[in-house]
Amino acid sequence: MEIDKVKNIFRQTYLADASRKENDAEHAWHMAIMAVLLSEYSNEKIDVLKTMTMLLIHDIVEIDAGDTYAYDEDGKKTQRQRELAAADRIFGLLPSDQAEYMRGLWDEFEERKTPEAKFARTLDNIQPVMLNNASGGRSWEEKCVHLNQILKRNENTKDGSETLWDYAYNNFIKPNVEKGKIKED
């Protein structure tokens, strides 16, 4: 039942209808579906089931570590340490074979070296951009997010899919800069 706690970890991104903020369970589910539907846009051939599983567990450490907002520079200073400790505890609850498999997938996601991890990271970066656009840029506007912050956070997004990054930039980010929802530098 430990995994049920991800339903109570709320992110800074609003749902598409802007009615409330998204939780980690919704975020993971949304990206797992995206992996199935958008896998053809991966730069490299990927194992879709492996990518889905990676996406479903990638934020499970936030049960202990909490969600670190994408543009929270102070929070990022301790994020890795908090998440490693959380991974040890949470994956340690599983039988050893499952713990080893799941922890391996989590580590792979964090390292961003395999085609699956690169594509999963692309989706993890693009999904909140999609939601921010759909909600009228609400979170970006509330947090006074600047274009340079978004570009820095997404500097490796194209590694998983150049096509999806180009689409997200031109259809979600650029129009929100033009509308003033994202601050220009």
Regions from the PLM with identified roles:
Residues 1-185:
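Alpha-helical, largely C-terminal catalytic domains
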